[in-house]
Each structure stands twice: as structure tokens, then as C-alpha cells.
Swiss-Prot record:
This is Probable endonuclease 4. PANTHER family: APURINIC-APYRIMIDINIC ENDONUCLEASE (PTHR21445:SF0), ENDONUCLEASE IV ENDODEOXYRIBONUCLEASE IV (PTHR21445). It comes from Staphylococcus epidermidis (strain ATCC 35984 / DSM 28319 / BCRC 17069 / CCUG 31568 / BM 3577 / RP62A). Zn(2+) 1 binds at H68, H109, E144. Its EC number is 3.1.21.2. The gene is nfo. GO terms for molecular function: deoxyribonuclease IV (phage-T4-induced) activity; DNA binding; DNA-(apurinic or apyrimidinic site) endonuclease activity; phosphoric diester hydrolase activity; zinc ion binding. NCBIfam families: nfo, PRK01060.1-1. Zn(2+) 2 binds at E144, D178, H213, E258. Coiled coil: none annotated.
């Protein structure tokens, strides 16, 4: 099963450290940010320790890794040209880093229209992607399904389809299907996942899905909040998420957990990924999971 989580990439080890962390959690794939998601400070490609990282990946049987673009990129911004231009320039550099790391997809939040309206936001996203996707490489931008918080674009399959349809080189666009976001946007992931997939297929095409973010939700369906919960402890529930993870459609697609660290003490929170992945592999919910994470 191709399953992993978000892991860190930092210090001198960089990609090698990411591979070691993923191996510690029993993963077969993983997702990384090339630096802090909240800023544009990045190391040079030659400082990412790629060769040793890829050797470690081979040793540990890790493949199909995914890069996530930082949150600060907002190519839907119609009011501040400097924000749009920063997003376009930085996204292009992130694509170069993604290619150097050997990843095929970089996940991107489509952006927020900051009050100009969805249609104007979508047109701006299309403009930005058309600038970025003229360069010659084979990295795909995976547009993430969003929860609809604030002025986010991409809360419906139709909005994502509109973006894809408007982009010239849209063979370089894929989709990252996030279970929490889709649930929070109002789709019935919990009780009718096949129905949700059928709708997605009719509007976008399931062959576009190249990454799945596997997250439970702290919120009721349709809340448009985007607050992740540990697997089985939220409003989607273990059975539905287990069904998603083992779905034939996603057999060869990286499934990435972005569930919250566990613990009340902010300085001593524990990563949940090893035990969550073990639980999904066994296909049996463990109500004591959070306590076990704290004592591991």
C-alpha cells in the first residue's frame, strides 16, 4: 500500500532526513515542503542532499514522493499584483526543486480571491498557471480540493474543472483529493464515497487524481472550516477513511496523512503517523490510539 505522511525536510540531512523519518513511521511514500510553508526562504538545490536522500529512499523502499507548495503562494489574488507575481515566480522555482528531488507532483492550494469573487479568482489562477506551465519539465501541479474557508477557490469540483479547462498545458495539471477538505466543502465522503468519486469523474475525471490527502475532520460536513482530525476521531470516521485508503482507484497513488500531532503540551506533541498507518494497514480501528501515541 502506497501510504505515508507529511515529514520534515530540514537541517543538513534534508531529503535524507525526510526518508529516515518516513521509514521510522513504516511508510512507503511521503510528502515534504522544500522549506517552511509560511515563508519563501529556501536552500539551493545543491544543498538539499538529494543523492544521499534518494539512496536512503531506495534502501527503505520509499517511492512516489510528493512536494507541497507553501501556503503563502496566492495566484488567485486580483487586488495585489505583487502577491500574484511573487506566487508565480516562487511556484516556478518550487517546480524546479520538485523536479530535482525526483517528485512528479507538487500540491498547490489554488488560492483565495480575497473578495473579488470566484470567477475573477479563477481567471487569475489560470493566468498564473499559464505563466508557470510554459517551462520544459514534466512536474505536474496537483490542485488541491479545498474546504471553502473564507474566499478559497477550489471548494467545488466545478471550480477545479474551470481552472483545468482554462489552462493551455493542462496535461501538466493533476488533482490532490483531500478527504477533510472535500467533507468540509459538503461532499458525503463518510456515507457515499463512491458517489462522490462518480461526481468527480463526471466533472473532472478520476484519472486526474495523483495524490490523496487522508485526513479526518473536526467539523460537521459542509462546515467549510478545514480542521484536520486524527484518523477515526472525527466526523468522517475510520470506516470511511479505511475505505478510501484501500480503494482500487487509488491503488498506485500516494496516500498522505496530514493529521495533527497528539498531546496537550505544545512543546511535547507526538507524531501520530506510525500508529495511524499501522491501524489502516490492519483495517481495524483502535479507540486507544491517541493514548498509545502519547506513550510511544
Amino acid at each position: 500500500m502506497l501510504i505515508g505522511s507529511h515529514v520534515s525536510m530540514s537541517g543538513k540531512k534534508m531529503l535524507q532526513g525526510s526518508a529516515e523519518e518516513a521509514h521510522k513511521y513504516g511508510e512507503s511514500t511521503f510528502m515534504i515542503y522544500t522549506g517552511a510553508p509560511q515563508n519563501t526562504r529556501r536552500k539551493n538545490i545543491e544543498d538539499l542532499n538529494i543523492e544521499k536522500g534518494q539512496q536512503a529512499m531506495k534502501t527503505y523502499g520509499l517511492s512516489n514522493i510528493v512536494v507541497h507548495a507553501p501556503y503563502i503562494i496566492n495566484i488567485a489574488n486580483t487586488t495585489k499584483p505583487e502577491v500574484f507575481n511573487l506566487g508565480v515566480d516562487f511556484l516556478q522555482k518550487e517546480i524546479e526543486r520538485t523536479q530535482a528531488l525526483g517528485a512528479k507532483d507538487i500540491v498547490l492550494h489554488p488560492g483565495a480571491h480575497v473578495g473579488a469573487g470566484v470567477d475573477k479568482g479563477i481567471q487569475k489562477i489560470i493566468e498564473g498557471l499559464n505563466e508557470v506551465l510554459t517551462h520544459d519539465n514534466d512536474v505536474r501541479i496537483a490542485l488541491e480540493t479545498m474546504a471553502g474557508k473564507g474566499t478559497e477557490v477550489g471548494r467545488s469540483f466545478e471550480e477545479i474543472a474551470q481552472i483545468i479547462d482554462g489552462v493551455t498545458h493542462n496535461d501538466r495539471l493533476s488533482v490532490c483529493f483531500d478527504t477533510c477538505h472535500t467533507h468540509d466543502a459538503g461532499y458525503n465522503v463518510k456515507e457515499d464515497f463512491d458517489g462522490v468519486l462518480e461526481k468527480f469523474d463526471s466533472i473532472i475525471g478520476v484519472d486526474r487524481i495523483k495524490v490523496v490527502h487522508v485526513n479526518d475532520s473536526k467539523n460537521l460536513r459542509g462546515a467549510q472550516k478545514d480542521r484536520h482530525e486524527n484518523i477515526g476521531f472525527g466526523h468522517i470516521g475510520f470506516d470511511a477513511l479505511n475505505y478510501v485508503v484501500h480503494h482500487d482507484t487509488f491503488k498506485n497513488i500516494p496516500k498522505i496523512l496530514e493529521t495533527p500531532y497528539v498531546g496537550e503540551d505544545k512543546k511535547n506533541k507526538k507524531p501520530p503517523y506510525k500508529l495511524e498507518i499501522d491501524m489502516l494497514k490492519s483495517q481495524k480501528f483502535d479507540p486507544e490510539l491517541k493514548n498509545k501515541i502519547l506513550t510511544q
